[in-house]
């Protein structure tokens, strides 16, 4: 059985939870205290972060890698496009999400930044600006790629879910 080591408040962990639930997989979630991680987390992931997926070998970490593995191993419903060119485009969007949105999410989630209101407001502003640029896509389509739920929706959903929390 797959085991997902996951933080209850970690948006990257929530991405993996979405994919596992969307696929209807039988899996176990082991919640990890993000501020007091057990030693075995660093053994499984040299960066000491969650999510981590354990299912035989290899042990996987980093949400986009875990999610692509699950999508390829269990292809229904398909979350990545079948066409290689479209798949490459989705991967570029995922990279853009990381660099243009989730960099700022990391600031908002950081304990160290909690006392730096200027850094928090800058992160909020950057997220707000980028989401405003993306707004036409949300108005036009049911999901980011159109009619079908995809890996792009999985990647963005944890951020959208937390907007009120982030302020």
Describe the predicted segments one by one.
Residues 144-167:
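GST superfamily/GST-like fold recognition
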Residues 1-144:
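GST-like domain detector, emphasizing the conserved glutathione-binding G-site
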């Amino acid at each position: 059985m797959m085991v997902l080591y996951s933080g209850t408040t970690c948006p990257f962990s929530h991405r993996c939870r979405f994919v596992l639930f969307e696929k209807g997989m039988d899996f176990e979630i082991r919640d990890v205290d993000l501020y007091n991680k057990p030693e075995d987390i660093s053994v499984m992931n040299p960066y000491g972060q969650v999510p981590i997926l354990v299912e035989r070998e290899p042990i996987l970490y980093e949400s986009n890698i875990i999610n692509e593995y699950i999508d390829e191993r269990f292809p229904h419903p398909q979350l990545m496009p079948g066409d290689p060119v479209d798949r490459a485009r989705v991967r570029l969007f995922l990279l853009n999400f990381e660099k243009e949105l989730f960099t700022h999410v990391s600031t908002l989630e950081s304990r160290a930044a909690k006392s730096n209101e200027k850094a928090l407001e800058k992160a909020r502003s950057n997220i707000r600006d980028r989401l405003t640029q993306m707004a036409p896509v949300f108005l036009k389509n049911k999901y980011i790629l159109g009619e079908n739920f995809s890996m792009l929706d999985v990647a963005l959903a944890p951020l959208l879910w937390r907007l009120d929390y982030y302020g």
